[in-house]
Amino acid sequence: MDAIKENWTTVKEAVRREYSLSDISYHTWVEPLEFHNVVNDVVSIIIPSDQAHALNYISSKYKSFFQVTITEMFDHPYDISFIWKRM
């Protein structure tokens, strides 16, 4: 969905605001995330390769934050998938 891609920074900032993320948490875990695509109502989010070791942590900690935020912002139910970017 182009709307999610076009508003990706706004999505991340909404997650930061709605869930009261500290500056450190936001800059470490959320800011580096990149929108990849939407297929069958699943939003794929790229985790940079230097954070690949934290895939499980990021998924367990932030998946629901992104799912709720994106669903509310775009008025459509989405699931979230985190993938890591290979160099």
Language-model-derived ranges and their functions:
Residues 1-87:
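Intrinsically disordered, low-complexity basic tails and flexible linkers associated
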